[in-house]
């Protein structure tokens, strides 16, 4: 099999495997966005807010934490937030997923961009996403860049910090845990 065919097959398998790995709780989209920080500055003319020191954003079950954040708002009132980790740390997010049980998705990176209109989180540099059932990891993705689309139940990983992929530029790592074990067959009498 030639290299192009292998890359296409690998990309297709990766997209299929990642589809359904994460689904944001739908009720979160109707909740207000709350942001707390040690210090904040607002510019109503430019529709920007700058927050520094222990920044915490919550929206329903979504919680994002970082050292610094910049919030911009479009004319329709939707917010776009960029989070930067404090030195030596990573910015984080955690959100409940729809479905039965205690299902969550968690992510971390040096920078996270969150668009509350599209409900897309982009993780840049040292990016990691984990799907959890309670506290037990069920799936993990690591890479230089990860995009998490809550509405589409999709996340994708790339080997370049700004979202592209190139040969020799690093690897994306996925760990998919096995499903529950099938019950042992009942011996016939």
Regions found by a protein language model. Give the residues of each.
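Mature-chain termini and adjacent capping regions
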Residues: 1-189
């Amino acid at each position: 099999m030639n290299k192009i065919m292998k890359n296409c097959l690998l990309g297709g398998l990766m997209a299929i495997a990642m589809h359904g790995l994460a689904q944001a709780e739908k009720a979160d989209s109707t909740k207000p966005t709350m942001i707390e920080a040690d210090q904040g500055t607002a510019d109503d003319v430019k529709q920007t807010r700058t927050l520094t020191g222990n920044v915490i954003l919550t929206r329903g079950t979504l919680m994002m934490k970082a050292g610094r954040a910049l919030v911009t708002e479009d004319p329709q009132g939707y917010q776009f937030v960029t989070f930067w980790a404090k030195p030596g740390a990573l910015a984080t997010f955690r959100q409940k997923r729809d479905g039965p049980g205690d299902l969550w998705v968690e992510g971390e990176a040096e920078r996270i961009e969150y668009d509350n209109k599209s409900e897309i989180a982009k993780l840049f540099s040292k990016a990691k996403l984990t799907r959890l059932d309670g506290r037990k990891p069920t799936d993990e993705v690591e890479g230089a860049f990860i995009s998490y689309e809550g509405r589409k139940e999709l996340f994708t990983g790339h080997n370049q910090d700004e979202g592209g992929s190139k040969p020799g530029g690093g690897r994306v790592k996925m760990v998919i845990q096995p499903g529950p074990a099938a019950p042992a067959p009942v011996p016939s009498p």
